[in-house]
Amino acid sequence: MHGLLLAGLAAALPLGVAGLPARQQSGLSPRGIDINPYRFASMAKYSEHKATSQMVHSFSYSKDDDYVATATKLVKSTFPNMTFRTVKDHYIGTNGIGHVHFKQTAHGIDIDNADFNVNIGRDGKVFTFGNSFYEGEMPKTNPLTKRDFADPVKALHGAIKTLKLPVKPQSAKAMPMKEAETFMFEGTSGALSEPMAKLVYIQKDGKLHLTWRVETDVGDNWLLSYVDSKETETVHNVVDYVASADYKVFAWGLNDPTEGQPTMIKDPWNTTGSGSPFTWHGDGEMDYTVTRGNNIAAQDNPSGGGQWENNYRPESPELSFVYEYNEQMEPEQYKDFAITQLFYTTNTFHDLLYSFGFTEEAGNFQMNNNGKGGEGNDFAICNAQDGSGTNNANFATPPDGQNGRMRMYTWTTAQPSRDGDLEAGIVIHEYAHGLSNRLCGGPANSNCLSELEAGGMGEGWGDFYATAIRLKQDDTRETDYTMGEWAANMEGGIREYPYSTNMQTNPYTYADVEGMSEVHGIGTVWATILYDVLWNLIDEHGMSKNIMPKFVNGAPSDGRNLAMKLVLDGMTLMPCNPNFVQARDAIIDADQALTNGQNKCALMKAFSKRGLGSNYKHGKNRVNNFDMPADC
């Protein structure tokens, strides 16, 4: 295992209490481990396209260089006296932009939160870049020479004790792996897979600290704990990877049972483009007659355990997944329907995101990448009616090549209980965590939404995609939408405000983030801004009723799909652990790359309305700026 992110839908709902979800959140993790005190501080810098064009005009290019070589030259010229390595996850996106990622090193040891990302345009020149490289004093001696640091077993004990992890390390032995100073622990219990440790530096408070990065997957938390290499009961920082045929289902666009009835859908992969060449029930080598295929394995998990391979799945040799549901049934009575619905929703979203550029090279979730690059063997494991929790959901995102894992829970806030698998917005929100964690910082690095503001945007992206997809043809910019209202049985939903373009209905601006210490609240602000972006683009370009977008010159022709595409492309451009301002600039730059900036003013109108105006400069305090660019 290597770095991963666990993201959940909401703060925990007290059992039996219907009125206290995310609207009354503290910093406490819904899974019981409060990582907020351990989050990395924000250090990323981002050079947007206009500034980059002015900055690198004198940069030496060679026509013989490929995009990786050009990116490498930029890093070397920017930090000529620093050492770094190229991360093996570079690719060219569907918008023609090449993405290359670098990790800073010291004495051959990774500085785990020191990253440099370079985006190369179609013309072979640097388009944008971002970095969080450490620029302070480097250690004078190589720590591997004296090895005056604790062994990894002590670091494992320290992480378990300090964070109160449910792992028993009494017989732990550190077994060396192929990668230098990397160990797997045998003889432990309580984790879903063997814990691991790797010796890395981190930058904190202006200094480098040598740490053991201890990785523990305990189900609802998949943690990277940075344990001091000498004082092993000191945990400096923590990253959590987890941040929620014929089918009779609620069709795509119906958010929950209040919006329509289940209908019969035949061979939906025929309408969702090239994302599933083996259909949804094959992976190029095996054909399945259950809810499993190249993209998704969907099953129940009533025990809440880590085993999934042999769990129950609906089976039909005729691939006819037709089951009954009505609102008077208990979730257990309609588990076949729920698993089928989960399988349908996640596969459809997979195929939609594929059309936008979340492909094999970009780190998507597939068993067989069909020779198209990236790391395979990492389809998403999707558990319906997971017994490890209630009133929530989560998604664990390890780096490319390791399975994503979704856990969908039942909600006890209504009688009978409700199944989150039937609320598409919750499923889409969770899968979107996999999207953002694979794209931000590159598919090999799942640590790039670990800081508070960046983690908040991870939550906001989930709500944005969930809301954009549920829009109806007769909606207008005056239409408001909530999040989680049906599953939680809570009028107004589980966010502080509904998503609305009306400042009286939802008054959030960027300045409101200043007083927030919890990712879901921050995420609501970000999704609120993106909801304005969405409607500005729909007003300009209309809204298609089709599941899949129509592309003209590489860009979706309608506003809804264009918004979703630009937000996705923006993720690929921004630096590791971005802030709102850098994410805004990345979306503007994504439009520059895709449409030559045709939508700049529509985008900036939305950003400036919510306090991210053109003259905003990120500082210690978040103060609104409502300025528009002079050319708008």
Curated annotation (Swiss-Prot):
Cofactor: Zn(2+)
EC number(s) from the headed UniProt entry: 3.4.24.-
Cofactor descriptive note: Binds 1 zinc ion per subunit.
Alphabetical list of InterPro entries matching this protein: FTP_domain, Fungal_virulence_M36, Peptidase_M36, Peptidase_M4/M1_CTD_sf
UniProt GO BP: proteolysis
Subcellular localization(s) per the UniProt record: Secreted
GO cellular component, one term: extracellular region
Cross-referenced CDD domains: M36
Function in brief: Secreted metalloproteinase probably acting as a virulence factor.
GO molecular function: metalloendopeptidase activity; zinc ion binding
Organism lineage string: Eukaryota, Fungi, Dikarya, Ascomycota, Pezizomycotina
Positions annotated with a glycan in the UniProt record: 270
Catalytic-site annotation from UniProt: 430
Signal peptide bounds: 1-19
Protein name: Extracellular metalloproteinase 2
Residue stretch(es) of the prosequence: 20-244
Domain of life of the organism encoding this protein: Eukaryota
Keywords carried by this UniProt record: Glycoprotein, Hydrolase, Metal-binding, Metalloprotease, Protease, Secreted, Signal, Virulence, Zinc, Zymogen
Family, similarity comment: Belongs to the peptidase M36 family.
Pfam families in alphabetical order: FTP (PF07504), Peptidase_M36 (PF02128)
Name of the gene this protein is made from: MEP2
Organism of derivation: Trichophyton tonsurans
Binding site for Zn(2+): 429, 433
